[in-house]
Amino acid sequence: MFRIKARVPRKVIAMGLPTAWGAMAITYKLACPLAQQDSLGARVVTSAVFFAVGTGLILHVRQALVRELRQVREVAGAAQSALLRPLPPRIDGLNVAAAQHSADRGARVGGDLYEVVATEHGVRAVMGDVRGHGIAAIGTVAAVLGSFREAVHDEPDLGRVLRRLDRALDRQLRERTCDDPVSEEFVTVLLLEIGRDGEITALNCGHPWPYLLTGTTVRPLARTDPLPPLGPFPLPTDLTPLPCGTLLPGDSLVLYTDGVEDARDARGRFFALQAALAGAVRNEPITPQAIVRTLFAALVRHTRGKQADDIALLVLRNDRTRLHCDAPGARGTARATTHNPQPTNHL
């Protein structure tokens, strides 16, 4: 035997309660003898009745808005978890920490993107920055990250990974142009590949170069001019990855978006990221998690919590001498290299 429980729709309740309160106020004014009197006591009672009805309406509207805001935040949190999935603390022998902050207070997801994946070709990372921030940038972030997560397993060369990202962005921009003909969007992208021996290769399209931390020394990973951002210009024919040295055991890479160095204080001074990193590692090497916390705290102090742009940080440290990744296929590890690599799923 089935029982069907009737449930009053929330919209009916939302509209019915204010209507009932309004009807009670009008009925009191038209039908109650006390409301027809012109004495001071009658006026006080009438005013009290209408004040109570008005207060009830305001509280009802406020409660509805709070409930709707809570639902929006839950949706935003789910979107953030789907787009910028929490990174495991260890990926193929690398210690990893990342964090991001949206400049739009109404959105938990901004225009910054990052991901780190262990593949048969090495550990591959992406850091990107979509023009604009907040809700409007989510579609582009999803297109670029989705393409990256597939391409890093399929393509043996970083140049072909970058072309996959460029095609995904082009499709996204064509769809956006149909809805918004004046929309001009671009994405800065940094692709990194770290081999088993720590060798670093990179392709940079308009993004800030990361910093390499070696002991207490802080220096840019490379000083060459990057390629133009993805979107406005076609990629060049030759996309040979740039050799950037070796990430030795104990060394760290700090990837970031331009919102970090562009952050200003009340006097208009930019945030000195290299100096902040030098201060963080002056006494002793610290973990990537501590570096992220230290930099975010320094940024909040510098801007007094009023960032004008999205901020993202990603720190990778080579801990391979202290961590052995012998379990093939485990989360955050890569399978042994094969001569005929097949696409794998990112767990």
Stretch-by-stretch model annotation:
Residues A107, L113-R176:
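Primarily the active-site beta-strand->alpha-helix module of PP2C/PPM metal-dependent phosphatases
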